[in-house]
Amino acid sequence: MRSDWIFGACAVPDARMRSAALARQEQLTKPPGALGRLEHLAVQLAAWQRTERPGAQRVWIAVYAADHGVAAEGVSAFPQAVTGEMVRNFARGGAAIAVLARELGARLEVVNLGVVNDPGDLPRVRRAWIAPSSANICEQPAMTATQLRDAIAAGADSIAQARSCDTQLFVGGEMGIGNTTSAAALACALLSQFPQAMAGAGTGLDAEGIAHKATVITRALALHADASSPLERLRRLGGFEIAALVGAYIAAAQAGIPVLVDGFITTAAALVATRLNPGVREWLLFGHRSQERGHAALLRALDAEPLLQLDLRLGEASGAAVAIPLLRSACALHNGMATFAEAGVSDA
């Protein structure tokens, strides 16, 4: 599969449905603007879904799992074996996102792109194997061109499946020991930030561990300083699951499926996606602001106002999943409230 599709045109939200939804909001039995951002969310979903009565019931959550070669630099508080162990946990339904997906009635897809501690074939896990791990970004590019293409395509495959199920909302998540280091390196390269400003605790590093992580990122940035395009920076500094998220976000925007972005790593992927294809930005909504140090800078770069700030830093799409009830409330109010005329209530 060629990768030039990522530069193709994105869908355009329906301006007529946006206007119709705005008009309905003005007629509902409440003062104008009294429901705050919930009103805006309903209108935005109406434009995205091309309907006056939007919904957020049919949700597709895809969690991409992959290991990172940079884990060899000691940038995580957990051993690399945890990635494969968590894939098993996803399959068994014991991970946070599995619990949240069940609670929400959402479809959960777990995609194994390559882990060192390979759990093999598991129920409810799609195997899109690329390699046991990306390469160590302090020594060489994270991915070959072929690996990058395959990872991006794996994300697009999720959207093809989601589209066939008439999905109303897509949520991407990730799992991979060392991936906050790769995401921070990508963010530094894209935003011209110092590693000290982007390196965070990740899985629970102390101050000394965070300082070491920043040093590792500095080494990686120096090695790949000649990478100038967003795609080449992704290839050299990213990882399989980050590239899959990029592919999923672009494919979703092209298919006209709204995306709810999770935390630090997924927002780094969203930034790459928008740099590759600016039309993607119009299809992104941001679930929460993570406790991870660099997330605020990424959100600012995307002019994003997240829905929640709960000091989360788990990943897995968990923060975005927690925000889904807000979207459902926005739609329920928009669709279910009476208008002034229907209720026989005097308008202002």
UniProtKB/Swiss-Prot annotation:
It is an enzyme of class 2 (transferase). Disulfide bonds: none annotated. Pathway: Nucleoside biosynthesis; alpha-ribazole biosynthesis; alpha-ribazole from 5,6-dimethylbenzimidazole: step 1/2. The keyword Ribosomal protein does not apply. The keyword Transferase applies. GO terms for molecular function: nicotinate-nucleotide-dimethylbenzimidazole phosphoribosyltransferase activity. Belongs to the CobT family. Catalyzes the synthesis of alpha-ribazole-5'-phosphate from nicotinate mononucleotide (NAMN) and 5,6-dimethylbenzimidazole (DMB). This is Nicotinate-nucleotide--dimethylbenzimidazole phosphoribosyltransferase.
